């Protein structure tokens, strides 16, 4: 699974003299754990065909297979090239990691069993007792490895072996109890952390919702102010047009007044007309002054509205920044929560594997007193399956 070719041998062993009440043994071993003699014996008992599944890195979408003869000519190797999809890469990596962890747990259990066997063997070697007990323990160890093939008789274990085994069981039981206590403490800590994370997450979500509502309101107010500014600008344009028209009329009246004054200064009618024109000019000037004041006031209002609009935009930008920070905090908390879940699952799987090991060990120690070994059934050729990954 590490990018090179790894071999995994699956063998169905049918010993000789198989009866109706016997049990078939199915063994899964790694290629690196088998010696040359064992591989040759397994190959002779298994069939003459070997299926190899090869993961190819080619970009084609076809499924190719290849039939290859082995070097010794006693078996056939059928290679099947599997093309993985890019979308299944994450699932494939997850399965690989899970298989690696399972293999690691199996290796730890096997190492513990091997250590226990070595301890028992060393104790029996130091004991100057009868050799029958050694033969009994050797039979037990061979039975655990699945290598017992001949007829064996039942022996009773010595009291010293039972005492040592009981001590080992008690130590394993204490270790399991300590690990269970640690697991419960870790679960309680995880639950408290989860509740704290949930409270913090809900608080951040509420703050994000409130910020979004405030942002929406600010955007609505900004749109309303923009509409008001547009209306004021249209009014200013109309007032400027009216101002230009009135200014043109004033100039025309002044021109006519000067003409009348130049034509007939002594004419009363012209004087009255001139007076009327002067009054009109004065009224128009007052109107112009009033319009000028209104124009200045509207310009001040427009400047104030523009300043308010800029302030609203600054507030909106600050709200956007706050919302982005809250989203980043939420993503960070979710990532921490997922990491905590993965750690708890890993710890629970490890504790479960240790619990299964202690149960199997206790069952084996209880059966050390009386051992009954059935006759090995006759071998039956089965196919040898090898999984190759490139």
UniProtKB/Swiss-Prot annotation:
Residues 88-126, 162-351 form a coiled coil. It comes from Bos taurus. It is found in: Secreted. This is Tuftelin. It comes from the Eukaryota. GO terms for biological process: biomineral tissue development. Keywords: Biomineralization, Coiled coil, Phosphoprotein, Secreted. One of its GO terms (molecular function) is structural constituent of skin epidermis. The modification Phosphoserine is found at residue 171.
């Amino acid at each position: 699974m590490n990018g090179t070719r790894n071999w995994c041998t699956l063998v169905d062993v049918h010993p000789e003299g198989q009866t109706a009440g016997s049990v078939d043994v199915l063994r899964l071993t790694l290629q690196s754990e088998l010696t040359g003699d064992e591989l040759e014996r397994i190959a002779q008992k298994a069939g003459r065909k070997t299926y190899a599944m090869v993961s190819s890195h080619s970009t084609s979408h076809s499924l190719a297979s290849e039939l290859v003869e082995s070097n010794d000519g006693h078996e056939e190797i059928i290679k099947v090239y599997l093309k993985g999809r890019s979308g299944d890469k994450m699932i494939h990596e997850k399965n690989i990691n899970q298989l690696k962890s399972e293999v690691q747990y199996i290796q730890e259990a096997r190492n513990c069993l091997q250590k226990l066997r070595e301890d028992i063997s060393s104790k029996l070697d130091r004991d100057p007792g009868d050799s029958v007990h050694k033969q009994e323990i050797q039979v037990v160890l061979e039975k655990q490895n699945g290598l017992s093939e001949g007829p064996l008789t039942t022996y009773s274990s010595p009291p010293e072996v039972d005492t040592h085994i009981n001590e080992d069981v008690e130590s394993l039981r204490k270790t399991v109890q300590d690990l269970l206590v640690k697991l419960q403490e870790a679960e309680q800590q995880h639950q408290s952390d989860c509740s704290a994370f949930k409270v913090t997450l809900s608080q951040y979500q509420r703050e994000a919702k409130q910020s979004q509502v405030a942002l929406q309101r600010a955007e609505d107010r900004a749109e309303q102010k923009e509409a008001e500014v547009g209306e004021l600008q249209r009014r200013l344009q109309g007032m400027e047009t009216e101002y230009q028209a009135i200014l043109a009329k004033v100039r025309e009246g002044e021109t006519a007044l000067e003409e009348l004054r130049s034509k007939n200064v002594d004419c009363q009618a012209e004087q009255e007309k001139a007076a009327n024109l002067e009054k009109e000019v004065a009224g128009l000037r007052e109107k112009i002054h009033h319009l000028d004041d209104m124009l200045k006031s509207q310009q001040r209002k427009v400047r104030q509205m523009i300043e308010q609009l800029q302030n609203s935009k600054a507030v909106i930008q600050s709200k956007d920044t706050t919302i982005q920070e809250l989203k980043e905090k939420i993503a960070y908390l979710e990532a921490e929560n997922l990491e905590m879940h993965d750690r708890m699952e890993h710890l629970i799987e490890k504790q479960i594997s240790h619990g299964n090991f202690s149960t199997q060990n206790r069952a084996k120690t209880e059966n050390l007193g009386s051992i009954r070994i059935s006759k090995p059934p006759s071998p039956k050729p089965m196919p040898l399956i090898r999984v190759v990954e490139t």
